[in-house]
Structures are given as C-alpha cells and as structure tokens.
A protein has these predicted regions:
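Substrate-positioning beta->alpha
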Residues: 167-172, 185-217, 228, 299
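Active-site "gating" loop of Rossmann-like NAD(P)-dependent oxidoreductase/epimerase domains
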Residues: 103-130, 145
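Conserved beta-loop-beta element that borders a ligand/cofactor-binding pocket
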Residues: 102, 140-163
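N-terminal Rossmann-fold cofactor-binding loop
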Residues: 30-34, 52
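Mid/C-terminal beta-alpha module of Rossmann-like enzyme folds, strongest
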Residues: 206-275, 303-305, 312-328
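N-terminal Rossmann NAD(P)H-binding glycine-rich loop of SDR-like oxidoreductase domains
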Residues: 3-23
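Conserved Rossmann-fold cofactor-binding substructure of NAD(P)-dependent oxidoreductases
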Residues: 48-71, 83-86
C-alpha cells in the first residue's frame, strides 16, 4: 500500500510512518519541514513540503505524487483547523481511503462525559471552530461529506508513550525521579485510560488498509489502569533504572482544591472527583472489535522513561502549590 501521511515528523505521525514502513508500505509524508527529526526524511519516505491548511499548496505539492504513484490511503495526523480539513477534502478527494485522527474532545458533553459509545453527540456547527473540540467535530463532518464511507474518524484519547513532549506523563516521571517527596492526589483507585502511541499508530496503518468507516473511540479500555496504577508504574520504572524515586504523598482532593491546586495542570491527569467519575468512562467496544491493542501501562511508562533519558525535554519547576511541605 502507498500511504500518504499528513504529518510524519511528530509524536503520533512519526510513529505512523515507522509502523507503515515496518509493515512494508510505501510512505509519502506531507509536512511544512519545521522539525528535522527522522521519519519523513528517511530514504524510504518521500517527503513533500506543504502547509496542509492551504488548499493551493497542498494541491500543487500533491500533483507529482498523484502522477507518479497515486496513494491508496491518507492518514491525517495534523488536523488542527477546519480549513485544513476542507483543503484535504478538496486536494485529496480522489484517494480511496481517509483515516482522520480526531479526538474524544469532539464530544459535546465531554468532559465530564461519560461517552458510552460513538453515538454520543458531538459539537454542532454552532460551536466555535476556533476551539479544539468543535474544530475536530466540524472537520469530521467536512471530511465525511467528501469521503463518505471511505472515511474512518479515529477519536483518539490521551496518547502517551516515547516521543511525548507534552508535560504530562513525563512530568510525573521527572518529579518522581528528581524529588524526595511528591504530592499526588489521593485518588489512587480512580480508573484512567490512555492509548500508547505505538498501539495507535500501528492500528491506524491497519485501518488505512481496511474498509472500516465512521467514528471510533481510539483509546484504552475503561479500567485498563487506575490513577494509582499509573503513578506506581512511574515509580517502578524509575527504580528499575537504578535511580532513586520519590516517596508519594497522597493528599485528599478537597485539600488540594482548597490550596488552589489546578487540576490537570499542577497534577497531570488529575480531575476533581465529580469530573473524574465520568470523564474516564469512554466506551471503546468498537475499537476493541476492530483490534486496537492496549499494551500494559507499565510497558508504556518504562519505555517513556527510557526515551526521556535522552530526549532533552525541559521540565518547568514544580509549582509551589504542590510542595509537600504545604500539606504537612
Ligand atoms: N496528543 C494527544 O494526546 C492527542 C489526543 C487526541 C487527539 N490527538 C490528535 O492526534 C494528532 C497527532 O497529534 P500529535 O501531537 O502526535 O501531532 P504530530 O504527529 O506531532 O503532528 C505534527 C506533525 O504534523 C506536521 N504538521 C503540523 N501542522 C502541519 C501543517 N499545517 N501542514 C503540514 N504538516 C503539518 C508537523 O510537521 P511540521 O511542523 O514540520 O509541519 C509534524 O510532522 C492530531 O490530530 C491531534 O489533534 C492528539
């Protein structure tokens, strides 16, 4: 199969390129050329420079690809504007299959959710497409109008794994590896779910060659781990590498909120109880039926920790609000 990847040098898109190559597919990657990371520039990859949000640029860049070796499928990993969806719908209309990486943020009532399955309502066209969730919902509709049942919209959940430069999972690893004591929310038994970037990328490549259509919640199964399980995996990964690991200091959510601790940003992945009770409840029965794998969180965390050792990722100082001395 000849796969056209929109993106190719980023977190998910780089992994999609790697997965496609390792399955023996030919890859053309479209980027603006801002990230000189391996992937799209590997010799087996045809690298095309264009801003995918610009229909004229995308059409012009795509013309020689179409003339030489028409792609069998698109995997769209950089849909960040509705104009970008329109540009792809126009420039790539003749490609037989389109897999769009959307987000569970497309759901109108998430958070707090729950999202039992893909029939839950998404944002309507009245919602501002300047915002991420409405933009994803609107982009899905634009692409569905163009590609119909040739479109699969993979509504990704939280993507984690090696190469993740968002300061979420890596922030926990960094804190645990560099402090003596680390404040954590005392919500250890709350179920949480993530999707490993390698599981998602490999599956997107399979999806590009399948005849699946419509939306699918592309994340880990409800209850795949808990908040405490994720933190324990971080601690275990640090300890297994021979580094000292911090003592975890659980603080009840009410005390955290009283102290002005910002959910999610100060303590990554932490949501207040009323939101957490439903926000992590995203039904993934269809993804499981379609074979989206879900490796153990311990494997994801261990590999992320190994990657972090050489990633040169700068971590901001831990906010004073979550200094353990404030909760003594
Ligand atoms: N990270 C998550 O937890 C999460 C959760 C749900 C959904 N998603 C979705 O997953 C997808 C991938 O996310 P990611 O963070 O892993 O992104 P990514 O793969 O790092 O995407 C960035 C890639 O796309 C290229 N790119 C970005 N804008 C472009 C443009 N206008 N024209 C051409 N190329 C462009 C970048 O190269 P250049 O900069 O060189 O152009 C880079 O290769 C996104 O659609 C995101 O909305 C992510």
């Amino acid at each position: 199969m000849h796969l056209l990847v929109l993106g190719g040098t980023g977190f998910l898109s780089g992994e999609v390129v790697r997965a496609a190559l390792s399955s023996g597919h030919r890859v053309t990657a479209v980027t603006r050329g801002r990230r000189p990371e391996p992937g799209a520039d590997a010799p087996a990859v045809r690298s095309v420079r264009a801003d995918r949000d610009d229909v004229a640029a995308l059409t012009e860049a795509f013309a020689p690809v179409l003339a030489d070796d028409a792609p069998d499928a698109v995997v769209d990993c950089c849909g960040y504007t509705v104009d970008g969806a329109r540009a792809a719908a126009d420039a790539l209309a003749g490609v037989p299959r389109y897999v769009y990486v959307s987000s569970i943020s497309a759901y109108r009532d998430w958070p707090p959710g729950p999202v039992p399955d893909e029939s839950a309502p998404t944002f309507g066209s009245e919602a501002s497409p300047e915002e991420y969730g409405p933009m994803k919902a609107q982009s899905e509709r634009v692409l569905e109008d163009a590609f119909g049942n040739r479109l699969l919209s993979a509504r990704a959940g939280l993507i984690v794994g090696p190469g993740d430069r968002t300061l979420r999972l890596t922030s926990w690893l960094h804190r645990i590896a560099t402090a003596d004591r680390v404040v954590v929310p005392a919500t250890g038994d709350v179920p949480v779910a993530f999707v490993d970037v390698r599981d998602l990328a490999g599956w997107l490549v399979v999806a590009a060659g399948a005849d699946w259509s419509g939306p699918v919640n592309a994340t880990g199964p409800v209850g795949m781990t808990t908040y405490g399980g994720m933190l324990a995996a971080c601690r275990d990964a640090v300890v297994a590498s021979g580094a000292p690991a911090a003592e975890l200091v659980p603080v009840p959510p009410a005390r955290l909120l009283e102290a002005g601790v910002e959910p999610w940003t100060d303590l990554p992945f932490w949501l207040p109880d009323d939101v957490a009770a439903t926000a992590w409840q995203v039904g993934t029965a269809r993804a499981r039926e379609l074979g989206l794998p879900s490796r153990p969180i311990e494997d994801t965390v261990r590999d992320t920790w190994r990657w972090l050792a050489t990633a040169g990722l700068e971590q901001p100082p831990v906010p004073d609000r979550v200094d353990p001395r404030a909760f003594a």
